[in-house]
Structures are given as C-alpha cells and as structure tokens.
A protein has these predicted regions:
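Residue-level signal for beta-strand positions within conserved beta-sheet cores that form or flank
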Residues: 90-92, 107, 137-140
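Short amphipathic beta-strand and strand-loop transition segments with alternating hydrophobic
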Residues: 27-29, 92-101, 143-144
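Histidine-centered divalent-metal-coordination microenvironment in nucleic-acid enzymes
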Residues: 93-117
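Catalytic "initiation/cleavage/transfer" segments centered on a nucleophilic residue
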Residues: 1-38, 46-65, 115-171
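Generic detector of bulky aromatic hydrophobic side chains
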Residues: 89, 104-106, 169
C-alpha cells in the first residue's frame, strides 16, 4: 500500500489529516474568556554585554524565544501579583505566538494575558509592561497593549504553520 492509497482509505473512512492552523483557530477562541489583554512585544535582533572592557555581542536565536517570553512573564507576574506570585499561589495565564515574517521585519511576540487579580487596575498595565520589558534586555522598547477578542486570536494564528504549532508558546 503506497501513501496515496493510505490517504484515499483514510478519506473513505472519514479520517482527514488535521490542519494545525485550523485546529488552533478553533481551539484558541475557547480560551477567550480567560485572556482579556492582548500584547505585542518587538524583539531586538542583537544586543551586547560588557565583560570588563570587552564588549560581547549576542544575536537572537529561535531557541531562546521561549526563555525570553518566560522571563518577561516572570517579571510581569512579580509586579502584578507581588507576594501571591512569590509564594507560588497565583500567576498570569499566557499564550504567545512568534511572528517571524521570514526576515522581512523584526520578530514579534504576540501574546494574550489573563487571570489578573480582582482588584487590579488595568490602567496601570502599560507602565508595568514597560518596566518588565526594560528588565528583559532582549525586548525592544516598542510594545503595545490591546483588548483581546476573537479577531486577535485569528490574527496571531495567522503565523501558525499548517503542519506544526512550533510558533505557539503555551503558558
């Protein structure tokens, strides 16, 4: 049995090959009630560190993006939840998607944030995001906050591949 015959047999049985992009577009809006705030972070392509008198230049790699997002969310959790986060009780729920644009523009992280404290004032969020982004040296100063809705999830899943969801960072 060759590959074509296997696909024909699966089609006859009603078992279609799943498309990751379609599956993400169907699944992510179900999380809409959990995630209220949409955020876009621009990543630097390179940065440097001073080691004594020696200047060391670092470049952004795709393998480091999960760690960059985790560090940013950690800093944001510390400033929003304070002691409740430090004692590991409460934290933000997050989803992020990497927008690569295949080298035509700088890499972006599009994220959705949810599970804020009940007494949290959302007007203070841009300042907290700016402070957390400044503490993460890989993130550029440019950032944007929006209201998270169904259109936002459709936009961020535009960058999900048909065969895998490697661009999605589940948090």
């Amino acid at each position: 049995m060759n590959l074509f015959e296997i696909r024909q047999r699966l089609k006859e049985l009603g078992i279609a090959q799943t498309d990751c992009k379609i599956a993400c577009r169907e699944f992510l809006p179900k999380l809409l009630h959990d995630h209220r705030i949409a955020i876009t972070l621009t990543l630097k392509t390179s940065w440097y560190s001073m080691n004594g008198k020696q200047k060391v230049t670092f470049h952004l790699h795709d393998a480091n993006i999960d760690a960059i997002w985790a560090r940013f969310v950690h800093k944001l959790n510390k400033s929003i939840w304070k002691n409740a986060y430090r004692s590991k009780r409460d934290r933000l729920s997050t989803i992020a998607v990497l927008e690569d644009a295949h080298g035509t523009q700088r890499k972006h992280l599009h994220g959705a944030l949810g599970h804020f404290p009940n007494d949290f004032d959302l007007r203070t969020l841009p300042g907290l995001v700016k402070r957390a982004a400044q503490e993460c040296y890989e993130i550029d100063v440019q950032h944007r906050e929006d209201i998270c809705d169904r259109g936002w999830f459709e936009y961020i899943t535009m960058h999900v591949d048909r065969r895998n969801t490697d661009n999605v960072i589940w948090g």
